């Protein structure tokens, strides 16, 4: 019985809210609409509050109520998880109400909305880059912001930056798994250039080492020497930067094989050059004999 009573009360509450919303939406009384919107806002009925706040900007333009309406509309959309729209509204507030004491908060919340809207690392990262820019702009424009807010912004920038690093690392790793070693090397090198302090640096070095090893050991003749020498040089970089690690040991092991392959390849080059020289010499001698014979026949 109690269960049905609770359901009945909930139904009556919904009907009452809907009636209240409908009445306010049909009204042209600014104060009535605003008060009703504020009631829904206080009750955390965000969609109802949004519907009414959306009606108010033109009605309150130029009045003291205007900043409050824009500010609460932005927050209502934020709480309703309409992050992109809320971010635009907070940004608009900060750019419009320059002397409002909540301007810094609005700038901060605009950045937070972009942060909330940022995609997972395996999706397009345009929103993530926008969020980083917004958070950095907030720090630049509000250097005297309270410590907690500044620390939170920096923390979120680090988090989003790591998300980008992971995105580009996984892209590079995908090239590596596909055995597209040239593309893998380029992608890992771009990652290290763009994010020199990345926590994925050592793993990137390991993949570059392996990719260069594969390129050198299985290269075509004309490119083999340069690729072997490049892999050998990089193995030394790995040992220098990560001494006494598995990465260093693996690089040393690869270098030993690379040096043997380079030595073998240099001998092949030497032999080919020798044969080429012999062929050219023989060709020259034959040409000389041909000319001598032609001279005798004259």
Roles of regions detected by a PLM:
Residues 4, 17-298:
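Acidic, polar-rich low-complexity tracts and alpha-helical solenoid repeat scaffolds
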């Amino acid at each position: 019985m109690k269960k049905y009573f609770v359901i009945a009360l909930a139904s009556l509450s919904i009907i009452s809210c809907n009636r209240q919303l409908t009445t306010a939406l049909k009204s042209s009384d600014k104060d009535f609409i605003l008060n009703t919107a504020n009631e829904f806002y206080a009750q955390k009925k965000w969609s109802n509050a949004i519907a009414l706040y959306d009606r108010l900007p033109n009605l309150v333009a130029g009045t003291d109520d205007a900043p409050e309406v824009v500010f609460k509309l932005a927050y209502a959309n934020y709480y309703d998880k309409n992050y992109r729209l809320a971010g635009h509204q907070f940004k608009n507030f900060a750019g419009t109400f320059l002397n409002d004491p909540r301007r810094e908060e609005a700038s901060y919340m605009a950045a937070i909305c972009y942060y909330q809207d940022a995609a997972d690392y395996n999706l397009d990262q345009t929103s993530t880059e926008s969020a980083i820019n917004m958070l950095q702009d907030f720090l630049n424009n509000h250097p005297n912001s309270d410590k907690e807010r500044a620390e939170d912004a920096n923390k979120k920038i680090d988090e989003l930056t790591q998300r980008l690093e992971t995105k580009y690392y996984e892209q590079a790793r995908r090239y590596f798994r596909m055995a597209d070693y040239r593309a893998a090397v380029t992608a890992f090198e771009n990652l290290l250039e763009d994010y020199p302090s990345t926590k994925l640096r050592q793993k990137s070095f390991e993949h570059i080492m392996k990719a260069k090893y594969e390129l050198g050991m299985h290269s075509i003749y004309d490119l083999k020497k340069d690729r072997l020498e490049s892999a050998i040089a990089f193995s030394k970089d790995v040992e220098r930067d990560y001494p006494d690690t598995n990465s260093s040991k693996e690089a040393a092991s690869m270098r030993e094989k690379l040096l043997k392959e380079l030595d073998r390849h240099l001998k092949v080059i030497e032999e080919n050059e020798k044969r080429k020289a012999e062929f050219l010499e023989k060709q020259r001698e034959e040409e000389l004999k041909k000319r001598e014979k032609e001279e005798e026949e004259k």
